[in-house]
Amino acid sequence: KSYFMGTTIEIIREYIEFSNLFGKNTENKIEEVLKEIEKKLDVKDKKACVVGVKEEGLFIESFEDNEIDFYSDNDALSQILGIQDIVIIKEENFKDEISKRLPVVARNYLEEGKSKNLWYEEVVPRESVFYTGVINSQHIDEFEDFCKKLEENLVQIGANATIGYGFTKFEEVK
């Protein structure tokens, strides 16, 4: 695998609470899994837990082999979150990793070949997953059409469309 989707137990619980507001009722299915992963992370010196089968030669940047544990039953978590290849990181380590690992891109506004404004941007890595809710209790037909268009098309969020950033695919979590 070339990358894993990193998250924390706290973020997953926030997602479950959020999705329950929309009637998804996923808490019972996943809470036992989260408790098992928490037990693995409570062990001294453990900083991350890979959800999936242990693979020979697996390397997760920033973590030594003895700092990583494995949780082999990834079906429930992957189905609820809609993603595969997950690594759960302790909250304090996650914050540190994010602050060190977000790509920073230097940008420069040029006017007639001369620099007028140099600035730096942190960008969210490709394949990042976000969640949001969309509700409408009125105008059901228009709402269904809106949701269909969201799922069928890429949506550009934020600036930087000209350099390929911000293109987003919306999918309903089932």
Give residue spans per PLM region:
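Basic, Gly/Ser/Thr-rich N-terminal segments that form RNA-phosphate-binding interfaces in CRISPR RAMP
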Residues: 1-174
